[in-house]
Amino acid sequence: MTKHIIVIGGGLGGISAAIRMAQSGYSVSLYEQNNHIGGKVNRHESDDFGFDLGPSILTMPYIFEKLFEYSKKQMSDYVTIKRLPHQWRSFFPDGTTIDLYEGIKETGQHNAILSKQDIEELQNYLNYTRRIDRITEKGYFNYGLDTLSQIIKFHGPLNALINYDYVHTMQQAIDKRISNPYLRQMLGYFIKYVGSSSYDAPAVLSMLFHMQQEQGLWYVEGGIHHLANALEKLAREEGVTIHTGTRVDNIKTYERCVTGVRLDTGEFVKADYIISNMEVIPTYKYLLHLDTQRLNKLEREFEPASSGYVMHLGVACQYPQLAHHNFFFTENAYLNYQQVFHEKVLPDDPTIYLVNTNKTDHTQAPVGYENIKVLPHIPYIQDQPFTTEDYAKFRDKILDKLEKMGLTDLRKHIIYEDVWTPEDIEKNYRSNRGAIYGVVADKKKNKGFKFPKESQYFENLYFVGGSVNPGGGMPMVTLSGQQVADKINAREAKNRK
């Protein structure tokens, strides 16, 4: 008899797991509370402006392509992606600008401000991150290893310690190899992919630089939601039954097993396995009603990653100095991280990510106008949340900074504005305290690991998404879905012996 898999949540991790389970011959039902598939890969359109509500950067497209290849199909028949050799532009408070290109040689050619020594150091750092990336790929990615003990067992103690570089933080690894202060800050902010601090995260996450340099940075034509639409189409073709606008209210259990879910309609649906794309702590808290003592223990080790104050701006002018992806850096990177991740306050001088897809895709804004998305990282929702007045002051601070750093009269040119706070993120995606990136990567608290993909409390409950390994970011959450499918397939194969 065909076994039934229930997937809770249609984010990239959930839809990826659903596709792989269906490709493996299981009956799969996916329940998503929103009316779209993709989770935070969402879309907002108004007044002829188009915005990616969630992620704006596509890296490591091969992870997505694999899902189509399992079905003997090509992703290019479903969605079009475009490589961006000019990966991003970095603006610094003193007026310095650095353009990051795919390739160290190209970066050197386009930045007269960088010396021969800077480029040599950058190449040395890339070589270091390549070594980490390669060993991480062997175990952490290919086999879905979930804990430090599993990694030590797989690679051996000495090999794991040296090649994963668990001795240093990410910023220490950068500062050891890079002397240019601008490059130090730019490379440190690669930690944005997992919503953490480069001063707290383990050096193993330096691999993010090599991943982007080797695999490239891509744009999904028409908006990144088209990638989610492509995965939804593939899932339906593979026989996944998708229920949008349907919320799972709780998970039923018997002893150490989950038995099914109760929907908001009152219907009970049985399952042999449940895969939750809802974050781990909200799943335990709201769907399984885990006791407070165990929840508190989990929250201490697996603290939420950062959230964001997300502004979507329709602007009645053009700023030629902007690239597709831009970063407006802070005067004091350490203080910015300290305020967000330790003091838990809205930062005085935030580093700001600004994406302007209109630079690549002119369909995203009216002629002569620009669609500007602004994202500084801020703390997740605290026990005493920020007030409307706090956010209003922070908005002014952001606009002041952008105008000061070259976006002249930005306020005057805003003709459309839509803002998302951590409270909006929590409400729409049921994320833990409004975090965008799942669990924070912290060398002291969790060695940079997120939750294991297998539940420690229930034998047939699995998790995917940003709160589990291999981590946040679109390719990683998609990979988590494939890894969970591999784990269930291996378990079933073992049971059949």
Swiss-Prot record:
A GO molecular function held by the record: oxidoreductase activity
UniProt cross-references to InterPro entries, sorted A to Z: Amino_oxidase (IPR002937), Carotenoid/retinoid_OxRdtase (IPR014105), FAD/NAD-bd_sf (IPR036188)
Pathway connected to this protein: Carotenoid biosynthesis; staphyloxanthin biosynthesis; staphyloxanthin from farnesyl diphosphate: step 3/5
Coiled coil: none
Superkingdom assignment: Bacteria
Class in the EC hierarchy, top level: oxidoreductase
UniProt-listed Enzyme Commission number(s): 1.14.99.-
UniProt entry tagged with the keyword Oxidoreductase: yes
Reactions accelerated catalytically: all-trans-4,4'-diaponeurosporene + 2 AH2 + 2 O2 = 4,4'-diaponeurosporenal + 2 A + 3 H2O
Any GO BP annotation: carotenoid biosynthetic process
Pfam families named in the record: Amino_oxidase
Cofactors (names): FAD
Residues the entry annotates as binding FAD: 7-19
Keywords: Carotenoid biosynthesis, FAD, Flavoprotein, Oxidoreductase, Virulence
Function as written in the Swiss-Prot or TrEMBL entry: Involved in the biosynthesis of the yellow-orange carotenoid staphyloxanthin, which plays a role in the virulence via its protective function against oxidative stress. Catalyzes the oxidation of the terminal methyl side group of 4,4'-diaponeurosporene to form 4,4'-diaponeurosporen-4-al.
Family membership noted in the UniProt record: Belongs to the carotenoid/retinoid oxidoreductase family. CrtP subfamily.
Protein name, entry field: 4,4'-diaponeurosporene oxygenase
Organism of this sequence: Staphylococcus aureus (strain MRSA252)
